[in-house]
Every structure is written in structure tokens, then in C-alpha cells.
Amino acid sequence: MSADSPSSPASSQAAEVQVRLPDGSLKTQPADATAMDVAKEISEGLARSVVAAEVDGTIVDSFRPLGEIADDENVVPLRLLTTRDESALDVLRHSAAHVMARAIMRIYKGVSLAFGPTTSGGFYYDFDMPEKISEDDFPKIEAEIKKIIKAKEPFERFVLERDEARKLCDDLDQDLKVEHIETGLGDQATVSFYRQGEFVDLCRGPHIPHAGMIKAIKLLSVAGAYWKGDASGRQLQRVYGTAFFDKKELASYLEQIEEAKRRDHRVLGKQHGLFAINPEVGQGLCLWLPKGARVRVTLEDFLRRELLSRGYDPVYSPHIGRVEMYETSGHFPYYRDSQFAPLFGSEVGGLLDAWSTRLDKDDLSKDDEDKLIAAAEVFGVKLPDYKPSASNDAKKDVLHRWQLNHERYLLKPMNCPHHCQIFGAQPRSYRQLPLRLFEFGTVYRHEQTGELNGMMRVRGLTQDDAHIFCTADQVEEEFRATIELTKFVLESVGLDDYRVQLSLRDPDSSKYVGSEENWDHAEGALRGVLEQSGLSFNEEPGEAAFYGPKADFMVRDCIGRSWQLGTVQLDYNLPERFKLEYKGNDNATHRPVMIHRAPFGSLERFTGMLIEHFAGAFPMWLSPEQIRVLPLSDKSVEYATAVAKQLDEAGFKVTVDASDGKVQAKIRNAQIDLVNYMAVVGPKEAESGQVALRDRIEGDLGSMPIKEAIARLQKEVETRQVRQAVKGSTVSIAETGGAATDY
């Protein structure tokens, strides 16, 4: 977007503000002074490294007048963010997205801008344009980017009234921005823009002082996208990139990307026969092949035994449930866009459901409404209470009453409503609490096709789901137990580099359910348990769900990427919605507290992550093929088969390579197939009842009696030794699957 644009409208503000620095000291500044001015007063060196500022927890431009962001007492609690601050990198990348968009608009004609947010590892910008961009175009785009960076032009913020903002975007032929102003900003009265040279973009910011702060930038890939994620909307081109304050950091990050490609679970999964995605079955629906299924069974058996020993009760629930149950839980229609359409026992059910959805979106013309009424009558459905002149809510109510009298089902999007029904299936006493229910339950999400990614993002996923129903007094101990369980599970598979994110409520918000007393108790209990555990954790006020605080384990893999695994979530909402009760020791009825927890998250995503973490080379206890017996020749096949039988009876996953060829080739094939151990046998071993054991990692271990080999290998399995993953050195944790923020 290119234009001359007005400055921000003047606002009434005090002539001076008091700036409170992190050390508690106060500085008096003119209201039109900026954080950069404060930095310059301290030192020119500091000013050169200032990227943005943090004011009372909110990141703002370093060049924004302090009077605009002072509190009611004209005080500005200010923290300067420099290139060393982690949050400053996000600001840099946001500005890099603008610079990239500016470069693309210089090169190509007819470019309509969508959104350009940051992601966990970089940024992207979506474009609607006549020409197709490919990775072959990246060099010329990057060359133009470098010209913009070299010019060091400043970013400037200005604010317009909504009508003025719409006119500006209309004048610039930016129809997507016009649509967003008209439909995407609610009742927002003003709109902020940023200008850099000839480029102007609607944006909430913040941005770096000038483009010259971008010391390293790289375009990474191009993909398809939809306007606002709506598959029925306009198709866009999405260009991804990343940026850093230092060229060495970029080089390290690019090496991390290359290493991630070498470990791609989709490639390794196909190469080693672990899983498959078949379009005839459906995108996002995993077929677990025998080797992958063995890994899954091992994980399930491991966790099942552990849960049973910790007082959990197994349950099973169906793959579908009545829509009314999900209306009670709130999952429907709130999460409808990410769910498969309801299943109906009547042919006309789908018609009425689509009809209701159109009314809900206020997207039904009079002609279409008449056609729907006629179509329903064709199926024998008459709706005498349906009045076209009534409000949409009244019309939806008529349709809903018809639906209530006919069976409607959903593919299960969550296990928790089913578990609530299991709790409520019989009277409960405080003596039965805590009640811990667990299930490896498969749920279904209608993810967009473009978001699907092997096992990492799927439409059918099996969660290691458990729900604990307890009293308020039991929350602390149950939380401690779930934290210990999650630690145990993660460390058992070699994931010992993690931190915990504790999501708390916003004390200034009233959106939360449950009493303030319960929230205070729960948050204090969670914080206390984490402090006592010695775990590294950070608190995130305002990040709690409306129904309770939670703790997420953020696990770093061997190449430095961070994965959200292992969630513990308190819930005051579902027990209330389902009217769950237990009789207390006071003989009165009470609501239980519900705790959701899943150490794996989903077996698909967890297994996919392990494939990449171990580069397909699973530790012995998880491996789908632990031992391969290699006979030296046909004469030794009979003995090899006998050895394999003994190993199988000892509980190992074992195969025999009875193919023709030299043993060196068989060893090489076993190494390629990532088999943990090879047992080489020939006439000498047959005569002495031994095997020549070979470790995939350490090589030849020499000959030994079969019983000795079995004892050695059993110890490795029983202790769940992990020797495969090699820690990598990376510049930062790149979060996987971070949510982008529009506008």
C-alpha cells in the first residue's frame, strides 16, 4: 500500500508524564517524548540497541509518544527492549514481514495485501495477486528487501477514524483491507497504520525504529492460504520468511531447518514403514502400519500399566455422541468450524442444519429461504411455527425444536463430555473421590486441508485422555501427582529438556467461571506445587481458559524445537454444565472439580515428534524391531530360527534375515533399517549355543551365550535406556504450531 497519509489526530493529554523505570526510579518527560528519547538520555549505545518498549506488560513502539500510553495518573511504567530481549525478536520479524510485502509490491503489480503476522519461527504475509510467486523468485525479492533495509527508513505510526481508514484503503485498491475494516474490527472506532517510505499498511504494531535493524533475513517457502482461513473464501499466496538481529543466528536457524528436513517424520515414516496417509481413506487419517503400530502399542501399554498402578480406572466411550450432549458441554456449536458436520438419522436433517447455520451467519436471502421451506416440504417436513418475518433467533429456535425430536450425532471432538456422563451415571460420595478415569479415546477434528501435516496435524487422533474428579481440597495433591506423572512419562522416552508454562487468569477480567475463592486456591496450589518440584516454569497471566488455570509442558527436542506436550487443566465449567454432584461428609451435595490431563497429548503427534527426535532410531524399549538374527549362510538358518524363538519368548520384537547374500550386506541393511541389535550366527555359534551380538550404535560386542545376551538386552528394555538422541546446539527454541495473530 503506497500513499501520503495524515498524521495521528491530536489528543488531549498532560504536558508531562512520569516514567517509572524497572529500578523504581522516576523520570519526568514531556508528553511527546518517546521511549527512544528516554534511552538516549541514558546512553547513545543503549538507544542504538532499543527495539521497542514494554509498558505495563504491553509491547509498544519505541517511537510512540509516551503521553498516548500513560495511565490515568500520567505514569508510564517503562521497560526498554533491546536486541537481547526474546520478545524483541517478534517485533523485528513483524517489521520484516512489512519489508517483504513492500519489496513484493515494488516488483509485482496488482498486489492486494491480506495479513502479515509473526509466527513462532519467523513470519509470513498473504497476498492476492495475478502472478504466482515461486521459490525461484526469492533471490530478486531478497535483493529488493536488502535495498529497503540499506535505506534505513523509519517506521511511522498514524491513526485514522474508521471511515477515513476505509477511504484510504479504498484509494489504494486494497479491497481485502477494506473488507477487514468493514467486517473484522467490531465496533472499533479508530484504526492504526504504519508507514515506511511509500509503503503503508493497516497494522496494530509494534515495529522496530527503522528497517536497518534487520541484520539477517531469509525467505523460506511459499504456500497456498485462504482469506481469514475460510476455505470458501479467496485463495491467497503465503510467503514465509524469518529474520534475526545477527547473521550467525540466521545461519544456525537455517541449519536447524535442514536438520529438521532430514528428520521429517513423513519421510522417515514412509521409509521405515511406520504409517501411511492414503487419499482413498482420507486426508489427515493415519494408517498405522505394523511397525508404527508396535511403537504405539508399546507406548499405550507403558502408560496403561503406570496409570493402573497410580489408581486410575480405565473406561471406554463411543466414537459418536448426541449433539445435545455437546450443546450442554459448549463444544457445539462454539467449535463447529473445526468439527465434522452432524450425522442425522433423517435425510432432511442435513438440510435443516445448513439452514440453521445460514441463519446464524445472517446469510440467508428471502429467495433462498423460500427454496429451503419448499425443499423441506418435499421431504415431508412441515414447520407451521416457522415465520419468515420472525427474527433469525426465533426461526433458529423452530428448526432446533425439530432437530431435538430427531437423532443428531457428532463424531466425538472431545472425550471429556463422555467422561462427565460416566461420572454422573451413578451416585457419588466424597469417599469415592478422587475418581480418576482414563481412556485412549479417538476424537475427530475437521482440520483444514492446508493445515494437515503427517501425524502432527490430523483429523482423527487418539488422546491419552484422563479426567480426575476431586474435591477442592484435593486439587493440590492431584495436581502434584499429574505433574509427577507427566515428568515420569516424558523422561522415560528421553525428553528431559522442558519447562512449564502456568496459565493464570487476568485479575481484571470477569469472564471466568467458578468462585474467586476457588480460583485463588487453585492458582496458589498449582504455583506451590511447581515451586516445590524445582521445575523451571513461567507464569502467563491472562492465558488461562475461562474455566480454569492450566500447566503446559514445553519440551525441547534434540534440535532445539519446542513442543507443547503434557497438559494439566483445571475445569470448573463442565461439572457445572453437566450438574455433576457428590455427597460430602456434611451430607450435602457439592460440585466436584475436574482436572483434564494428557501426558502424550495425542498418540499421533507424540509418535511423529518421537520419530523426528530420534531420527527414526527409537531406543530399544520403544523400537518396532529390536533384534534381527543374521545367519551366515543357509546352513545356519535353522539355528537362527531357534535363536529368534528364544528371543521372542523372552519378550523381544525379533526377525530373521534368511535372505541370500553376505552377512556384511545383512548388517548394512539392518543398520539402514535402524534395528537396535543384530545377532550374527553361524556354525561356530550353533555348536557353542552362542550369538555374536552387534549393537547398532557401538558395533561388535563379541560372542556370548544366548542367556547372557537376553539378560543384557532385557536390562536395557526394563530400564528404558535412551542412547540415540544427540543434543543439538541451536540459537533459540522454535515453537512448533504457534498461532498467528491477524491484523
From Swiss-Prot:
Region of interest called Disordered, as start-end residue ranges on this chain: 1-30
Domain of life, per lineage: Bacteria
Cofactor-binding details, from the entry: Binds 1 zinc ion per subunit.
Please explain the role this protein plays, according to its UniProt record: Catalyzes the attachment of threonine to tRNA(Thr) in a two-step reaction: L-threonine is first activated by ATP to form Thr-AMP and then transferred to the acceptor end of tRNA(Thr). Also edits incorrectly charged L-seryl-tRNA(Thr).
Q: Where is this region: Catalytic?
A: 264-619
Please state the gene responsible for encoding this protein.
Answer: thrS
- Localization per Swiss-Prot or TrEMBL: Cytoplasm
State the family it belongs to. Answer: Belongs to the class-II aminoacyl-tRNA synthetase family.
Q: Which UniProt keywords apply?
A: Aminoacyl-tRNA synthetase, ATP-binding, Cytoplasm, Ligase, Metal-binding, Nucleotide-binding, Protein biosynthesis, RNA-binding, tRNA-binding, Zinc
Q: Where is each TGS domain found?
A: 13-76
Residue numbers spanned by region Insert? 354-404
Name the UniProt record assigns to this protein:
Threonine--tRNA ligase
Quote the Pfam families the UniProt record gives.
HGTP_anticodon, TGS, tRNA-synt_2b, tRNA_SAD
Q: Which organism is it from?
A: Rhodopirellula baltica (strain DSM 10527 / NCIMB 13988 / SH1)
Cofactors demanded by this protein: Zn(2+)
Q: How does it assemble?
A: Homodimer.
